[in-house]
Amino acid sequence: MEEYGIGTCVYYRRKPFDMNFFDNFVARLFPKNVIRCKGLCWFKEEPDMCYLFEQAGKQMELKNAGQWYATMPKDELQQMLEREEGLRRDWDEKYGDRMQKLVFIGQKLDKKAIKEQLDMCLTDVEL
């Protein structure tokens, strides 16, 4: 439910972003009515690395958040999956724990447009 026209949009996908396409989205297409955005993303150029994207007002930052669990040695990963229910729940056979998960908060968000523009940043990659 939106109050005062402020709502949220959650973008969730498994495929990687192309870094150049995502950079173009952030630099040229990022909606002006987004107040805050935060979440995890990954790129075909660095498939083992998890990135944290944060935006507040005009400030935007993309920083390395370490490696995905999917990059762990198989025996360690198996133990981790047995212990961590959340990891097990979110696990994907192809992508492991890699995901695009961005939450946008803003006024009168065009959720469909945001998702379509971000979908244009996705690419196929063989892991």
Report the location of each language-model feature.
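P-loop NTP-binding site
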Residues: 1-127
